[in-house]
Amino acid sequence: MNSKMKFVGNWGRLGMKFNIWEDCPKVPITELLSFIVDNRGKTVPTANDGWKLIATNCVTNNTLFPVYEKVRYLTQETYETWFRAHPMPGDILFVNKGTPGRVCMVPDPVDFCIAQDMIALRADDKKIYNKYLFAVLRSREIQQQIYNTNVGDVIPHFKKQFMDQLLIPVPDRKIQEKIGNLYYQLSYKVELNKKINENLYVQAQAIKK
C-alpha cells in the first residue's frame, strides 16, 4: 500500500473529533451525482492522430490524473458526433472493468475522450465536494465495497447498476473541503516529486554518456 492510500485509510481521526465512517450519514453515490458520462457499448472508430482516446490502463490509483500510455486517437468529426457526452474538468474517471474502482481526476483542460470500460462521475456540488468524493473513492473502505460487488471470474466487472450500493459518508461541507483539499494537495506533491526525480535521473544518465 502506497503512502497516499495509507493516508486515506487512516483519515477518520486526522485532527478531528469524530470518524467519518462511523459518525456521518452514508448516502448512495448515485444520489450525490449530477451526471454520469457513459459512452460504453460501441467500438470507437480510431485514426492515426487527433483526440486521445484513453483506456483503463491509463487510470490508476497511484496518479492524480490519467497517464497517456498506449492511447489511441480519433478525428474531430468522431469526437463531435460519436459520443453521448464527454468528461469535464473536475469529473472523476471510474474504471468498471479489469480492475474496477480505479479512479483519477479529469484535468483542465481535457484533451482526451473515454469509451469502453470506464465512466466519468460528475459530483453535484450542492451535495458533495468533488475532491472529497475523489478521496473517499480511493479509500480502503470504498475499494473493499467495490471488490465485494465485482462479478466475473476471469475479468472482474463492476456493473453500473451496482453504483447505488456504494455508500459515501457525507460530513459537513467544511470537513469535506478539508479532507478533499488535503488529499488532493498531497497527491499533487507526491506526483510532482516523482516527476522531478525522473527528470533528475534522465539528466544524470545524459551526463554519464
Where are these regions (language model features)?
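Short, positively charged
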Residues: N130-F162
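Flexible, active-site-proximal loop/turn residues at the rims of small-molecule/cofactor binding pockets
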Residues: D38, T60, T99, P109, ...
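Non-catalytic DNA-recognition/assembly elements of restriction-modification systems
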Residues: M1-R40, Q165-K209
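A short glycine-rich beta-alpha junction/loop motif
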Residues: F112-I119, V151-G180, Y184
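Sequence-specific dsDNA recognition surfaces
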Residues: P25-P45, N57-P89
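A short beta-sheet element
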Residues: A55-T56, Y73-R138
